[in-house]
């Protein structure tokens, strides 16, 4: 069983594109979460140089197309979380790699980092928004999140894993029971707790740690995390 989420990554104000890419990929490939890089794989890129390679592809895209949209998406992250005790780190990495390959149709470079530091094993799949030919960008289409979840379900079934059943509107999840559907608020809450475990010096540092995980901070009368 795997719950998925598709996150569009943007360049943060005050930081270069290369810095933003490095922040996001460094968090995903954190040795403390991947057993010193044991559970990292890649497609058409080198994990140690992925930020530089992604950044170089943006320059090549600009050279070829002369297009540089404001607020452009620099990369996408697929968060894929598995039910505790159902999968090994090795198989989770395989499922993540297949998900990245089939969702991008093999047209975009990506890394897969499998985090094993929590009860539920989960993948961070980061793929370049620019394609391998550096002449097109991945476009987040309508219902892409639904398409991603269905693809993940298919791959899970192919691996003999369970999938998230469709629950009836009237159903309620009892406290203490593992939910059939992983609540996105629970995922966000855990990510915030993970950031707090790193003991940020202040609120600004906490927001920076959340941005490194792929969240976008919206400024206004009230700050929001998306």
Predicted features by range, described:
Residues 1-226:
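N-terminal nicking endonuclease/strand-transfer module with a His-rich metal-binding environment
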